[in-house]
Amino acid sequence: MTGTATNAELTERWQGALMNNYGTPRLPLVRGAGTRLWDADGKEYLDFVGGIAVNALGHAHPAIVEAVSTQIASLGHVSNLFVAEPPVALAERLLQLFGRDGRVYFCNSGAEANEAAFKIGRLTGRSHMVATQGGFHGRTMGALALTGQPGKQEPFLPLPGDVTHVPYGDAQALAAAVTEETALVVIEPIQGENGVVVPPAGYLKAARAITAATGSLLVLDEVQTGIGRTGHWFEYQAHEGVLPDVVTLAKGLGGGLPLGATVAFGRAAELLQPGHHGTTFGGNPIACAAGLAVLETIQAEGLLENVKSASEKLRDGIESLGHPLIAHVRGSGLLLGIVLTEPLAPQAQQAAQDAGFLVNAPAPDVVRLMPPLNLGDDEVDAFLRALPGVLDAVTNGDGRAKE
């Protein structure tokens, strides 16, 4: 039975058949096209969540549909016992975008990409690792050990590894924690799941200097910021003089298909050897064909520039509203956080949904926007027109929560 259930019926079926690790999702969706989605009852929404920064080209983009359809009709899955052309081509293209010699390991998600980075760190012969408070790197055990959110870790203690967590953006704390016994330091250029937190200027450059001095690897988790999300192919490229040893990718790379990558350079690129790591589905030709289509379309359609212009229009428009519930906007490109003066983000998320806009509340006082990279002016204008009413719906008109 598909395609005929109502919102209520589909939600009830979810609750009866799927594990409760996500709780009950807030909305059943059945169709998408471009920046728009439709629920099972036929209501239309503008998508400012983008599958949590996954749908770089929106929904049902012709380039991805064609690439996937063509690939599955010729070669679907062969495993890593054999060579297929799409993963080779995608790895080569990624290395071109990095502008450096290196090697790529393909997997299926950001957590898996960070697990591979964890193992690369162990293969240096050192075991100590440094990550940041508030950071999010995934929920598998190694990635969870790196994640700096105790609430997510607590049910699964003890976790693997000797990991020290330091305040995000604090270069002095980082320097104090990193020693010649430190295998790697892992940092998100922007903390997405922690509420779109941007570090101080010079932080990544300082991290590079600190790790270089101790011979530690610098791992940048670009799972959320990579693949054009911030107006650069990779966010670290906006920071002069920063060359990481490892970059982890996922989300936008597959454009909606499960695809992650761990990209390593220099000595880090040579550490994984046969038998050290692997995944049956990693480098799947269909997912890699989609990844190639994403990269080609971003370049062909000038989407890096579109991200910058759409971001500027969104940020300026939101801040110019002068709404008492808006404190400021932070982030980069089309990864933006509307910081509220009151912890009303979950209520604002629901009010936006009621108004036909899908947004996300990663923190009590932050509304996160992660729309497709091809977001148009009309969609930006529609969001800006609706936002005051959305915020008014959860306040008394003075920025304070309704009783």
Curated annotation (Swiss-Prot):
Q: Where does N(2)-acetyl-L-ornithine bind?
A: 139, 279
- First-level EC class: transferase
Q: Which note does the record give on the cofactor?
A: Binds 1 pyridoxal phosphate per subunit.
The highest taxon in the source lineage is Bacteria
Q: Which GO terms describe its molecular function?
A: identical protein binding; N2-acetyl-L-ornithine:2-oxoglutarate 5-aminotransferase activity; pyridoxal phosphate binding
Family matches, as Pfam families: Aminotran_3 (PF00202)
Q: Does the UniProt entry include the keyword Protein biosynthesis?
A: no
Q: What is its main location?
A: cytoplasm
Instruction: Please tell me what else the database record remarks about this protein.
Output: May also have succinyldiaminopimelate aminotransferase activity, thus carrying out the corresponding step in lysine biosynthesis.
What NCBIfam families does the entry give?
A: argD (TIGR00707), PRK01278.1 (NF002325), PRK03244.1 (NF002874)
Q: What is this protein called?
A: Acetylornithine aminotransferase
